[in-house]
Amino acid sequence: MTRYIFITGGVVSSLGKGLASAALGALLQARGYSVRLRKLDPYLNVDPGTMSPIQHGEVYVTDDGAETDLDLGHYERFTGVPASRADNITTGRIYQEIIQRERRGDYLGGTVQVIPHVTDAIKEFVLSGNLDVDFVLCEIGGTVGDIEGLPFFEAIRQLGNELDRGQTCYIHLTLLPFIPSAGEMKTKPTQHSVKELRSIGIQPDILMCRCDRPIPKDERRKIALFCNVRETAVIQAMDVDTIYDVPNAYHLEGLDDEVLSVFGIKGSKEPNLAKWQTIAHNIREPEGDVTIAIVGKYTGLKDAYKSLSEALVHGGIANKVRVNVKWVESEVFDTEDTAFYLEDVDGILVPGGFGERGSEGKIRAAQFARTRNVPYFGICFGMQMAVIEALRNVGGLEGASSTEFGPTNEPVVGLMTEWMRENELVKRAAHGDLGGTMRLGAYDAMLAEGSRVAQIYGSTVISERHRHRYEVNMTYREQIEAAGLLMSGVSPDGLLPEIIEIPDHPWYIGVQYHPELKSKPFEPHPLFRSFVEAAVEQSRLV
C-alpha cells in the first residue's frame, strides 16, 4: 500500500519545505523504503521556464525535458531518485488541461468548476504512477491562506477522506520567531497558521517548527496543546551549518519515527545514516580552502544558481576542501578591470544565462582565465562566450558574436531551429513561443578519444541534461580549433557542438549542457570534481 505525506507551510514562505521533504525522503530511504517526491505549485504559469530567475530561482530540468521548480533538485540530490515531468504540476498546467478538455467537449456540456474539476485533476496527479512506491511525499508550494493555493489544500483534504485510514500524513512547517526585545520565542504565528489550516479541514499530524535556537519545553507543550498535536509531534527544525546535516538533525529530533507512528508502522529498522554523517563531517572539517568566482548576471538571488552552488559543494566534498564562492556580477566588467575581481581566485565559472546584458563581462572573464592560466568552467552560455572570446582575440574574427544579441555578420552562435531527439527530428519556428521550445532534457554526446573530458568521464559516450535554444555554429569549427579550442564533444550525429577544451591549459572546459543538474553529494559530477581539483592545484601556485 502506498502511503501519502503532504507537506505544507505557514507564516512565511522560504522556510525550507523542499529541504524538509527531501530530508524526510532520505530518512525513509535509509530505513529501506522506496520514495517518490512531488511538488505542487499554485502559480498560474504553466511551468517556470519563462519566469525570471531573479523572481523564481533556477529552473531545474529533468531527463525527460521538463522545466520544473528548484525543489526537485533538492529531491534528486538527497534521494538519488530521478525526477520527471510527472513530479511537478502548476495551477497553470491544470487549468490548461481542463480548458483543453472543455473545448473538446469532454465534460458533455457540464459547468466546469474548481470543485470538482480542478480538485479532481490535482488528486489524479497526486495518485498517478505510484503502484511500486512505499511513500509519496507531496510538497504544496506557498503558504496556507494564499488564495491561489486553496484548490490544492482542498484536494489534499479530500484525499484524507477518500484514502484508507492510516494512508495519509499531514506535516505543517511553521516559523517560531525569537523576539530579542522580549527575550522569548513566540508561538502565536504557529497557532494562527494551524488555525488557518484547520479552518479548511486539515488537522496536521506533525508540526515542524523552524527556529534558530532550541524550543523550551513550556513552548513545546503550549504548541502541542493549542495546535491539537502530540508533544512528540512538535519537531524542532533548527538552523544547521550545512543542508546535508538536515537528515541527521531531523532523525535526532524523531521526525522519521513520528511519521511511521502516524501510519501505525512498528518494528521498522533504524536508518543507516553513515553516508550523511561522512558528508557533513567533510564539509565541517575540510583539509583546505579554494575560491571560485561565479561570473553571472543573476547574482542578486543565489537561488538562481542553486544546483550550481551545490555541485561546487559536492566537488569540494570529493576533494576534502571548502569551496568559497565569490559572486561577481558580469556587468561590472563593462566598466572595471577584470583583474581587480579575479586575480585572487583559484577558478572561474561562467554559468548559463539569456540575453545580451552582461555578455561582454562574461567574455572578458573567459579571456582572463585563458590568458592567466586560471581554471575555467563555462556552462551553456559560458561555453558560447568562451568560443566568441577565442575567435575574437586569437582567431582574428573581431565581429564574432551571437544572433541572440541581434544581427551579426559572424554568427558564431546561432538559434537552433532543428535537432534530433531519439531518432526523430525536432523543429522550432525561428519566431515561435518561448515557453517549452528549447532543446530540453537528456541528450547523448560523443567524446573525442584521449581528450581531457574523456579522461574525466572515463568514457567516450555520456548523457547530460540541456536547456538552450542557441548553439555554437558548426560551420566555424575549423576556425574555432585554429584558435586553440578543441571541440572534444559533439552530438551523436556530429551536427551540434557539446564540449570545447584547451588541451595545453591547466583546465579550460566549456560545455553546452548543465552538468550541475546531475551532481549529488554522495556522487559528485566528474566535471565538478575535476574542476575543484584543478582549483586546488591552482591555489598551491599562489
UniProtKB/Swiss-Prot annotation:
Allosterically activated by GTP, when glutamine is the substrate; GTP has no effect on the reaction when ammonia is the substrate. The allosteric effector GTP functions by stabilizing the protein conformation that binds the tetrahedral intermediate(s) formed during glutamine hydrolysis. Inhibited by the product CTP, via allosteric rather than competitive inhibition. UTP binds at residues 13, 186-191, 222. Belongs to the CTP synthase family. It catalyses: UTP + L-glutamine + ATP + H2O = CTP + L-glutamate + ADP + phosphate + 2 H(+); L-glutamine + H2O = L-glutamate + NH4(+); UTP + NH4(+) + ATP = CTP + ADP + phosphate + 2 H(+). It is an enzyme of class 6 (ligase). L-glutamine binds at residues 353, 381-384, 404, 469. InterPro entries: Class_I_gatase-like, CTP_synthase, CTP_synthase_N, GATASE, GATase1_CTP_Synthase, P-loop_NTPase. CTPSs have evolved a hybrid strategy for distinguishing between UTP and CTP. The overlapping regions of the product feedback inhibitory and substrate sites recognize a common feature in both compounds, the triphosphate moiety. To differentiate isosteric substrate and product pyrimidine rings, an additional pocket far from the expected kinase/ligase catalytic site, specifically recognizes the cytosine and ribose portions of the product inhibitor. It comes from the Bacteria. Residues 291-541 form the Glutamine amidotransferase type-1 domain. This is CTP synthase. CTP binds at residues 13, 146-148, 186-191, 222. The active site is at residues 380, 514, 516. Pfam families: CTP_synth_N (PF06418), GATase (PF00117). Keywords: ATP-binding, Glutamine amidotransferase, Ligase, Magnesium, Metal-binding, Nucleotide-binding, Pyrimidine biosynthesis. GO terms for biological process: 'de novo' CTP biosynthetic process; pyrimidine nucleobase biosynthetic process. Mg(2+) binds at residues 71, 139. Homotetramer. The gene is pyrG.
